């Protein structure tokens, strides 16, 4: 185990267009092989599609989608004796945000056909309407936590 203590978290700079840290984190999640300008094109293109289709501010729609995707509870394995129990725990705010963004991008990538811009826009709009793969993932996570409620006293 490392002996140097905790590494300090680096602050994410807000993106230049929407001046939002959440959008900046989305861009970083979409990015592959360090191609940030391409990731920015994809995200801003997706936001333009959202503005076109909904007639609302894309940042608002994105925030709504994130709120519908971010999990409140998750299960973590805890070994007690010879058995491993899935113990439900609350998710810390930073992890909630990163999981929400990760799931949005992951399920956007899994969508068939079309460009990544369109897939990301569709996933964000679906999540804002409480449908789509990323919302289903959150619900499944919550179901797992609910099913393992009996082991909640094994928290650490």
Curated annotation (Swiss-Prot):
**Which terms in the Gene Ontology molecular function aspect does this entry carry?**
rRNA binding; structural constituent of ribosome; tRNA binding
GO CC, one annotated term: small ribosomal subunit
Q: Report which superkingdom the organism of origin falls in.
A: Bacteria
| Alphabetized Pfam families for the sequence | Ribosomal_S7
- One GO BP: translation
What UniProt keywords apply to this chain's record, in alphabetical order? Ribonucleoprotein, Ribosomal protein, RNA-binding, rRNA-binding, tRNA-binding
Indicate yes or no for the key word Ribosomal protein. Answer: yes
NCBIfam families from the entry?
Answer: rpsG_bact
Subunit (UniProt):
Part of the 30S ribosomal subunit. Contacts proteins S9 and S11.
Matches recorded under HAMAP family:
Ribosomal_uS7_B
By what name is this protein known? Small ribosomal subunit protein uS7
Name of the gene: rpsG
């Amino acid at each position: 185990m490392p002996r140097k203590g905790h590494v300090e978290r680096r602050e994410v700079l807000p993106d230049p267009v929407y001046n939002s840290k959440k959008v900046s984190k989305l861009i970083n999640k979409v990015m592959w092989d360090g191609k940030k300008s391409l990731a920015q094109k994809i995200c801003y293109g997706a936001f333009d599609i959202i503005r076109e289709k909904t007639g609302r501010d894309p940042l608002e729609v994105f925030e709504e989608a994130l709120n519908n995707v971010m999990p409140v509870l998750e299960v973590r394995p805890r070994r007690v004796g010879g058995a491993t129990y899935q113990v439900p725990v609350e998710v810390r705010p930073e992890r909630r945000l990163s999981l929400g963004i990760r799931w949005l991008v992951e399920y956007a990538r899994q969508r068939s056909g079309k460009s990544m811009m369109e897939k990301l826009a569709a996933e964000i709009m679906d999540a804002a309407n409480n449908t789509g793969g990323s919302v289903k993932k959150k619900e499944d996570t919550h179901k797992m936590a609910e099913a393992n409620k009996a082991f909640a006293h094994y928290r650490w």
